[in-house]
Amino acid sequence: MNDLELLGPRAYGEALGSAVLKATAEDFQVDEVLDIPLTGEGEHLWLWVEKRGLNTEEAARRIAKAAGVPLRTVSYAGLKDRQALTRQWFSVQLPGKADPDMSAAENDTLRILKTGRHKRKLQRGAHSANGFTLRLTQLVGDTAAIDARLQLIAQHGIPNYFGTQRFGHNGGNVVDAREWAVRKALPEQRNARSRLLSTARSYLFNKVLAARVAEGSWQRAQVGDLLAFTDSRSFFPAGEAECSDPRLAILDLHPTGPQWGEGDSPASGATFELEQAVAAGEADLRDWLVNAGMSQERRILRLPIGGLTWHYPSLDILQLEFVLPAGCFATVLVRELVDLVPVGQTDNPCVF
């Protein structure tokens, strides 16, 4: 499956060139934004960790081993990419214990930048956002056109697709999810079950968003929509008055799409009909999610790009800096600009 099948159409037209992303880990930097002041005391040791070429789960295992504790006592807010330079928080539960010597966890792929005590463990999803610094190298394209498109993106946002990373290599997770759905069964292994259910929900959401992008309504509220603020999980129905709410124009308020699950959809009108039609086209996945007991949720269709800045360190490098809400994908921004090609290859675009 290619990225058009997994995501959908671009909002701003065809790619304006090509580039390489992640030639080195430093080309994709992520800083977790976590607004939790540490109390300085408590049974939980929090660690601000920088990792390079290491995924979050591997880092957690290394931290647990160095601390001499079971892996289940190590917590983190969110998963970060392996092929990147990332900084994020971990917590380790140490009831009645002094701070352990964590040096055994450190090497050239993991550094502990600071530590502190807190009364509570770090919860999944506790981070509010992620800050990104991306460096696109071997850039081939019209920089004036790229600048103009970036200005549009800063003003209007982008479609909030789940990135291709969610779906595995060539969409393999979607294939696996469909096979389980046809069998009306769930994987016994918890991680596999969670991964495939998440894949199915994300895929259905992307198909709804793709239809809204195709009809030009992805950033426009219409009667029957459910609206949500950027950083809120709650939503409310849109009537005529809500469709002209000025907060829509300043990218504070957005139409939403379905995270499929059990229960009736609270959408109505044309929005309800579109979402039901998309789900009917993937009836096995829809029913699988309902029968698995997934709850009906919503996700904003439009993604505002916080603090977007860019410059060209050299003629063939574009550096982007921006902030995204937790759970949103930096690569969908890159996709609105250029096609990505593998390192060492600049003629044939690849799916990323």
Curated annotation (Swiss-Prot):
UniProt catalytic activity: uridine(13) in tRNA = pseudouridine(13) in tRNA
Enzymatic class: isomerase
Keywords: Isomerase, tRNA processing
Cross-referenced CDD domains: PseudoU_synth_EcTruD (cd02575)
InterPro entries per record: PsdUridine_synth_cat_dom_sf, PsdUridine_synth_TruD, PsdUridine_synth_TruD_CS, PsdUridine_synth_TruD_insert, TruD_catalytic, TruD_insert_sf, TruD_pseudoU_synthase
PROSITE patterns linked to this entry: TRUD, UPF0024
Protein known as: tRNA pseudouridine synthase D
GO biological process assignments: tRNA pseudouridine synthesis
Residue intervals of the TRUD domain: 157-303
Alphabetized GO MF terms: RNA binding; tRNA pseudouridine(13) synthase activity
Family: Belongs to the pseudouridine synthase TruD family.
Enzyme Commission number, as recorded: 5.4.99.27
Active site annotation, chain numbering: D81 (nucleophile)
SUPFAM superfamilies: Pseudouridine synthase
Native source organism of the sequence: Pseudomonas fluorescens (strain SBW25)
Entry function: Responsible for synthesis of pseudouridine from uracil-13 in transfer RNAs.
GO CC annotation terms, alphabetical: cytosol
